[in-house]
């Protein structure tokens, strides 16, 4: 199981943001870190494959940002992360 972090910045469009969040949740088990930073656990997917589902799925614009990073073997530390999110990341 791989762990990915998804970071995005969209124009102020609640419908498109909700669509992106829905697409993120469809990629695998997920946790919301902040409003614009999510983590997913998924098998048999690459960062490019995830990006290519999310970006076109919301018709991302040139002035917006979307980044997918594989953090499977990365160390992490945090302050004030909700316990359920920290537990999810550890699990």
Name the predicted role of every residue range.
Residues 15-31:
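Short aromatic-glycine-(Arg/Gly/Cys) micro-motifs in beta-strand/loop hairpins
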């Amino acid at each position: 199981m791989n762990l990915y972090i998804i970071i995005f910045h969209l124009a102020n469009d609640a419908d498109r943001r909700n669509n992106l969040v829905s697409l993120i949740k469809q990629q695998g088990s997920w946790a919301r870190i902040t409003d614009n930073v999510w983590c997913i656990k998924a098998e048999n997917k690459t960062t490019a494959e995830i990006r290519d589902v999310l970006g076109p799925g919301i018709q991302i614009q040139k002035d917006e940002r979307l980044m997918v990073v594989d953090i499977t073997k990365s160390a992490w530390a945090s302050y004030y992360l909700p316990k359920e999110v920290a537990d999810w990341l550890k699990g």
